[in-house]
Amino acid sequence: MRHYEIIFLVHPDQSEQVGGMVERYTKLIEEDGGKIHRLEDWGRRQLAYAINNVHKAHYVMLNVECTGKALAELEDNFRYNDAVIRNLVIRREEAVTGQSEMLKAEENRSERRERRDRPEHEGADSADSDDSDNSDNADE
């Protein structure tokens, strides 16, 4: 069996069906003896260019190990499912199980947002507690 990285884009009006689609595709791979190494739902994102007058899509990435038969069936499912507006299958030399760069960047962004928002609230609290500590020391 070979390793593949699969990314497919779902029409934004069909975003609520993504869970069912992923379940169906993973079941197809696993029933044929394949294995899902990584599954990431990147959510709805802006497209670089419009596809069929659609400017956003729901992105899903899978790293799988499967047979050629299962891959062909999966590609047929993509082709005949109107909700899938684009797909990309890349053959990999080995299984990729780590977090993708896309998710790492998203986590970094959210961490920076948290840090940016946190000092305003914590800074005021720590300043108050420092003042009270200093006043206690002054009495001694």
From Swiss-Prot:
Keywords: Ribonucleoprotein, Ribosomal protein, RNA-binding, rRNA-binding. GO terms for molecular function: small ribosomal subunit rRNA binding; structural constituent of ribosome. Residues 96-140 are annotated as: Disordered. GO terms for cellular component: cytosolic small ribosomal subunit. CDD domains: bS6. Residues 125-140 have a biased composition (Acidic residues). One of its GO terms (biological process) is translation. Residues 103-124 have a biased composition (Basic and acidic residues). Signal peptide: none annotated. Belongs to the bacterial ribosomal protein bS6 family. Binds together with bS18 to 16S ribosomal RNA. This is Small ribosomal subunit protein bS6. The gene is rpsF.
